[in-house]
Amino acid sequence: MFKGSIVAIVTPFNNGAVDEKKLRELVDFQIENGTDAIVACGTTGESSTLDNEEHLNVIKIVFDQAKGRVPVIAGTGSNSTAEAIHLTREAKEIGVAGVLLVTPYYNKPTQEGLYLHYTAIADAVEIPQILYNVPGRTGVNLLPETVARLAGHKNIVAIKEATGSLQQASEVMALCGDQIDVFSGDDFITFPMMACGAKGVISVTANIMPKAIGDLTDAFYAGDLEKARQLHLDTLKISNAMFIESNPVPVKTALALMGKCSDEVRLPLAPMSAANKAKLEAIMKEYKLI
């Protein structure tokens, strides 16, 4: 259903408010440079610090600006199952192609709780749903066995695996077969994950290098594994630089250095330290991004 390079787009701000003009420009920048789909209001889009009205408005803006050129996927996850169902219903009304559902954070549910949470959403709203496992941020790991239980639901079509573990991603693929598509949630292992059977990446790096990440996944699908491997190695340093501080602080700083949008983030995130900004700027100069 979805494949290739999917950008987890940032939400630009201007003096505390969502910057609609810059967001629309970023959507065009992505599509013009070969991005296959766009996730609005993911982790990189600072969904956790958008209020409900802003959250749905960002999804609407991205969907409207995409104009059907690429699929738009809405982040509608929450640590409240009822809230996740509400956001998913609203996103479906907007017209998005699918939703991305992060595991409930802070509550620390059991595997049974995770299974019941995702099943409740999938039962409630008929729309393609992508599970999102990122234990480094949520405090809970959606285990391969639980993914396999969920994979049989007709509305659950994929998982974004952001454990950083090639072993866990491989176990998901081994257990689920073709029942569910797997996407890398970490740019630094996109190529190895695709070699194991992943369909692509939901990418942070694509915010600043959409063509390179798109070329990587395109080369893989074209059977040019050497080109894909080389692009993987070539983008490794910049992908790692996107995490020298908490995401999306580095990628927003990078976009600001490129003149694409403000580096403004919402508290409790803070602007990048001067030392890390200098490191990031040096790496971006190596890549001729600035």
UniProtKB/Swiss-Prot annotation:
Catalyzes the condensation of (S)-aspartate-beta-semialdehyde [(S)-ASA] and pyruvate to 4-hydroxy-tetrahydrodipicolinate (HTPA). The record marks T43, Y106 as: Part of a proton relay during catalysis. Belongs to the DapA family. NCBIfam families: dapA (TIGR00674). GO terms for cellular component: cytosol. The active site is at Y132, K160. Pathway: Amino-acid biosynthesis; L-lysine biosynthesis via DAP pathway; (S)-tetrahydrodipicolinate from L-aspartate: step 3/4. The gene is dapA. The keyword ATP-binding does not apply. It comes from Trichlorobacter lovleyi (strain ATCC BAA-1151 / DSM 17278 / SZ). The keyword Cytoplasm applies. Homotetramer; dimer of dimers. It catalyses: L-aspartate 4-semialdehyde + pyruvate = (2S,4S)-4-hydroxy-2,3,4,5-tetrahydrodipicolinate + H2O + H(+). This is 4-hydroxy-tetrahydrodipicolinate synthase. PROSITE patterns: DHDPS_1, DHDPS_2. InterPro entries: Aldolase_TIM, DapA, DapA-like, Schiff_base-form_aldolases_AS, Schiff_base-form_aldolases_CS. Keywords: Amino-acid biosynthesis, Cytoplasm, Diaminopimelate biosynthesis, Lyase, Lysine biosynthesis, Schiff base.
